[in-house]
Amino acid sequence: MRLLRSLARKIASLKEAKVALKVASDPRKYFNEEQMTEAYRIFWQTWDGDIIRSARRFVEVAKANPKLTKGEATNIGVLLGLFIFILIGIVLLPVIVSQVNNLTSGTSPQVTGTNATLLNLVPLFYILVLIIVPAVVAYKIYKD
């Protein structure tokens, strides 16, 4: 829980997060296919394992890239929002899996029976959300 609170505080301090959430509701207005391809390339270039440092580097590189600065200034906010969403999801996945395993396995599991079966499905649904949300956003952007 401390990890979640510290991540929430760090994300809340970013001014772009508010704009990112606003623009993420309809990204087709702000991106074209070329911009999404370039943002994806920059995403993997700037990722170094630290969410905050990677996000800052991503914004710096994206602002300097002429392919991404052609559109409105809110493009950076949406890209940052998607970047942070994916990074937090990747970082929290092992934590969720280990907590589910601790609750449902071992010599004296705390959750048994049908509830354990349902609890074991939580990581699967979490992974589906991590895949579906960026895919839907990318589809809406590509459709434009």
UniProtKB/Swiss-Prot annotation:
It comes from the Viruses. GO terms for molecular function: structural molecule activity. GO terms for cellular component: membrane; viral capsid; virion membrane. Its main location: virion. The chain crosses the membrane at residues 76-96, 118-138. It holds the Pfam family VP1_VP3. The keyword Chloroplast does not apply. It is a multi-pass membrane protein. It is found in: Virion membrane. Coiled coil: none annotated. Keywords: Capsid protein, Membrane, Transmembrane, Transmembrane helix, Virion. InterPro entries: VP1_VP3. Disulfide bonds: none annotated. The keyword NADP does not apply. Residues 1-71 form a propeptide. Belongs to the fuselloviridae capsid protein VP1/VP3 family. This is Structural protein VP1. It comes from Sulfolobus spindle-shape virus 1.
